[in-house]
Amino acid sequence: MRIDVVSIFPEYLAPLELSLIGKARQDGILDLHVHDLRSFTTDRHRTVDDTPYGGGAGMVMKPEPWSQALTAVAEARRGHQGKPVLIVPSPAGERFTQALAHELAGEEHLAFACGRYEGIDERVIEWAGEHFDVRPVSLGDYVLNGGEVAVLAMVEAVGRLLPGVVGNPESLVEESHSDGLLEYPVYTKPAVWRDREVPAILLSGNHGKIAQWRRHEQFRRTSERRPDLLEVFDAGKLPKADRLALQELGYDIVDGRPVRRQGTAEPAG
């Protein structure tokens, strides 16, 4: 996979040289290029922003440097079928999820446009649609100073799904959000630490019961911490053990979705 990132702070992306993503770059699994937007300006001050039409606070990123930068990125796709995907981090975008990370991991070429100030001139987004599949994406319902932090998170979330990046592929299957639920709690040695014991079932050697306990803990933790995930969880084809786990937590299955039973207290969390 090729990834291009355009930013006025290219040094912000330095962490992508570390850990598993850095190793994936060294191994040729991930071809990552970071571009300085100011390199695509033409004035001696390397200006990338200007005042907004209509007034208002803040500055807006100028269209021409962005068009030059994105044209250069699109050139890398010449000779290939289809458009690259351009991710524009924005609090006004669709929410970034594990499902979206899996979708993007199937693409050959991703580009990221890191906005700053009040954002990028909207005409850039419209124009870019001629050359890219443009997708404004939000990490969540909050505002950051720029897109770089979001890009770090998204590149890692997508990159680690590529074959060969994570050493044990099975770990990707058991993670939070991989099946719409949060991950179960994990423990390591010693078995007793500061008078706190590892759950006995994990020391039993009974792999079937361990798997059942972990699944139950997924439902419990999701119910306590992210009940919104259960509201959209597809429970229509759950095995009997999973249905019993949900019932114990105060949920009934209605039209294929878990619904909290009336009179059941909301989970603490």
Swiss-Prot record:
It comes from Pseudarthrobacter chlorophenolicus (strain ATCC 700700 / DSM 12829 / CIP 107037 / JCM 12360 / KCTC 9906 / NCIMB 13794 / A6). Belongs to the RNA methyltransferase TrmD family. It catalyses: guanosine(37) in tRNA + S-adenosyl-L-methionine = N(1)-methylguanosine(37) in tRNA + S-adenosyl-L-homocysteine + H(+). The keyword Nucleus does not apply. One of its GO terms (cellular component) is cytosol. Its EC number is 2.1.1.228. This is tRNA (guanine-N(1)-)-methyltransferase. GO terms for molecular function: tRNA (guanine(37)-N1)-methyltransferase activity. InterPro entries: Alpha/beta_knot_MTases (IPR029028), tRNA_m1G_MeTrfase_C_sf (IPR023148), tRNA_m1G_MeTrfase_TrmD (IPR002649), tRNA_m1G_MTases_N (IPR029026), tRNA_MeTrfase_TRMD/TRM10 (IPR016009). The gene is trmD.
